[in-house]
Amino acid sequence: MTLPRHRFVSAKTPFFTAITQSSMFYLRLLSQFIRNALIREMMFPANFLIQVVTRLFWFAARVALFRLIYSEVQQIREWSRDEYFTFMATGMLINSIVEAFFMPNCAAFCEQIRTGRLDFALTRPVDAQFLVSLQRLNPAMFTQVLLAAALLIMSLSEINRPISPYAVILYLFYLGVAVTFFYSLMIATACTSIWFGRNQGLYDFWFYITIFAQYPRSIYDGTDAGRFESGEALQFAFSWVLPILLVVTIPAQTILSTAGHPAFALAMLASTTACFVLSRMVFNWSLGHYRGASS
């Protein structure tokens, strides 16, 4: 693959000019990755079609399941049917973006180490983590992005509640925070391939993590105020230790104008920032222990 030409900036280049030039270079590089991914998929249209049909079936089955559940009850833990579908669409948007851009690359990280292709990435005039994280994409997941967006719009229209432009901007920001959080977890986990050689548990890790994020935080509330229940233990762990519940619940509550305590949003932002910085440190530290294809 030929990389776009990168105009290297000198020490005398103004700061904002340097940032702009670097950003434009990486945007061009990302657009080339997307174009290459589409070309690869069109070489095997049957495989692409099967993936799309599978996503459509999974989406339809999940929506039908919760329509059936909500036909028997009006609310589940203060979430009405359309409010829950808004939450579901938010979770799908986050998952589909992560799986489209980052999952194929993180899953292939150990293969790059085994075959020596990681050496190639490290010798390119590009940030190694950017190249390792985004060089292969899964275009079939873009179908799920569209489905999730359609479900979100339909659910919000059914609720018929006014949404301010500020809420939309904040919602999109929180989506970006959530994607960053899950990416940070994923790339840090993938880095273990440098020591283990193979890391086949990445898909299992992602599957179990996203199971907990499929339901709003309030679902894990206890039923007995007099004792600390197992659901509340999970709620605490996945809210304050590893905020998996917050990164999906808070964006949904924001667009629904039912946001909870500001401490939840602060915890999500702080945890995501810490996770991203830590994942960057783990990646660079792992590369320091990488000995090349011959090892």
What are these regions (language model features)?
Residues 1-22:
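N-terminal amphipathic/basic-hydrophobic helices that include classical n-h-c signal peptides
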